[in-house]
Structures are given as C-alpha cells and as structure tokens.
Design a protein with these regions (language model features):
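Helix-biased detector of long, well-ordered alpha-helical tracts
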Residues: 1-312
C-alpha cells in the first residue's frame, strides 16, 4: 500500500520499515525471532535480542520500545523460559530499550525474539539503497558464526573459540551504530545476518544499481572459522545463499574457495556493512577499532558491470 508517510517499506530489501510521524521524528519498526542456536537459555535470549535490535541500528536509529515474542513447548522448564526472557531483557537494558510486554504461544520448538520500535530523524535514515561508485565497504563484526555454531554441535572447536563466537553474537551493534551515525557521507548501510555477506552485499548492490566487489583476503574472521570451513563444516544455509547470489556473481580467478564459503555463511547477530567514500571510511575505522579491532574494509563499489557482485 502506497503512503507518503511510509519512508522505507519492503521494496528495497531494507532491515526495517520507517514511518514519518513529524518533520523531526520517524518511527523504525522491525521484528525478528528464531529457534535456539545455543544450549544456554539466557545466552539464547541475549543473542536473539541483540539480533532483533540490530535492524534499528542498521537504519541509523535508536531502539526505544520492544515486545517479546516467545514460543514454548509444554515440556520446557519454567526456569529456562525465565532465563530466555532475562537474557533478552538484559540486552534491551544495555540498548536503552524498554520491553513493555509481549505475546507467548505454545509451539513444538522454542522460539524467541523481539518486535522493536526505534526512532530516527527522517533526514538521517540509513538505507540499503544508495551505495555509490568510489565507495568502500566497512564491516564491523567478523564472519563465521554459522560455520562455528555448526562445528560446536560436533564439538570440533576449542572452548576459547566457542566462547568468542558466543560473545560476538551477543554483542549489540549499539557502539558501531553510534560510530556510523557520526561518520560523514554514509551512503548505505545494512546488517549482515541470514543471507551472509554475499547475500546482503548483493541486495545493496542491486538496489543501488552498482557493482560491489568483495575481497576474500580482507574478510575479518572469527577464531577457527577458516579451519572449520576448510574442513568442509559448512551449514546448509551457506549453500542456499550461494544459490541465491550465483546468477548475479562473478568469481574472479584469484578467489579462494574458503573465503567464498565464509562470505556465504549465514550470520546470527552479525555486524553492520557500511558504504561510504574511502576518505570518510578511514576515520570511521579508527573509531570502530577502539572497541571492534576486527573492523575492516572488505570491498568497494563501482559502476554497474556484468554482474552486481564480484568476488576476488
């Protein structure tokens, strides 16, 4: 439905809807929930909440109000249900966001997430559209959560690497979002989640009418992610992501398969992907690296060539 107050809808593959309520205020609305990817219920609540809140940061806003979405089987202990909600609440408090209630239904498998409301000035919305030739792409979190959570199920990674991936997934994009909002000339922004870096880069390129080239050798990776990918520990979602982008992707002869696999890896609560001119990316990187030292330039934007996406 067309409405002049709807500033961002579903047509541009953006992370959230944005609705203008005045000349000074626009409302950001998003929803996200999923099944557990970790055994600890409190940690699951933290990760699910961080993942849902991320969409507001990706749009250049600040989350302010949220509602719980919870699906629980009859057999799930009440202590586990409480722990899930407490984990989500802890992340909302960290974000400065109030959870005002929610809705619970019975289901065969646990699911948890948030419906989040945030605010942004109508003239300062960050969108998936707008990447320009000459821009570079900055990524604020390392890749590999899909590969590593798959490896954890088989007890293949070290306790240190396991704890590190959990910490990355539970980390809010709040500080990164603040840094991006303060940066000059940000032309486009999204967060890297289920479609992987390849999928989300393709959507940005396609919606912007440009070609994005990603550099495998510069991708920041979580500890032991490369080792697991080289062993063939690739989640099914990575193959689906590759199938999705394949018609729009040129893989150059210099590309290494392991980096291509990790670029397709579906992420949970991944980082922000930001398009801006190189001269403005350098001060942004300096700011990001004070709290996220893995932040890196992972690609660049050019005029549209044969395909929307290139990988070397």
């Amino acid at each position: 439905m067309s409405n002049p107050a709807l500033l961002v809808g579903y047509d541009s593959s953006d992370d959230a809807a944005v609705y203008r309520v005045s000349d000074e205020v626009a409302v950001i609305e998003t929803v996200d929930f999923f099944t557990p990817i970790v055994d600890d219920p409190y940690l699951f609540g933290q990760i699910a909440a961080a993942n849902a809140l991320s969409d507001v940061y990706a749009m250049g806003g600040e989350p302010k109000l949220a509602m719980n979405l919870l699906c629980v089987p009859n057999c799930l202990p009440k202590d586990d249900i409480r722990a899930i909600l407490e984990g989500g609440h802890a992340k909302a408090v960290e974000a400065g966001c109030v959870i005002a209630g929610g809705h619970t239904i019975q289901d065969n498998e646990p699911k948890y997430g948030l419906c989040v409301t945030g605010f942004v000035h109508p003239d300062r919305i960050l969108k998936n559209v707008g990447a320009q030739p000459g821009d570079v792409l900055v990524l604020t979190k390392p890749l590999g959560s899909g590969v590593l959570t798959t490896a954890i199920k088989a007890d293949l990674i070290s306790p240190a690497a396991r704890d590190a991936v959990y910490a990355h997934m539970a980390t809010l994009n709040k500080k990164a979002g603040n840094a991006v909002r303060s940066a000059k000339n940000v032309h486009a922004c999204t967060d890297v989640t289920g479609f992987g870096l390849l999928g989300h880069s393709y959507e940005m390129a396609s919606c912007s009418g440009v070609t994005i080239r990603l550099h495998g050798a510069t991708l920041p990776l979580m500890d032991e992610a490369r080792d697991m990918a080289e062993m063939g520990i690739i989640p099914a979602g990575a193959y689906r992501n590759m199938d999705y982008v394949k018609p729009h992707l040129t893989v150059l002869p210099t590309a290494q398969q392991v980096f291509l696999d990790l670029a397709a890896d579906p992420q949970t609560s991944g980082g922000l992907l930001v398009a801006l001119p190189r001269e403005d990316a350098e001060p942004l990187l300096r700011e990001l690296q004070t709290f996220a030292p893995w932040s890196a330039i992972v690609g660049e934007v050019s005029e549209l060539r044969a395909t929307a996406l290139e990988f070397d």
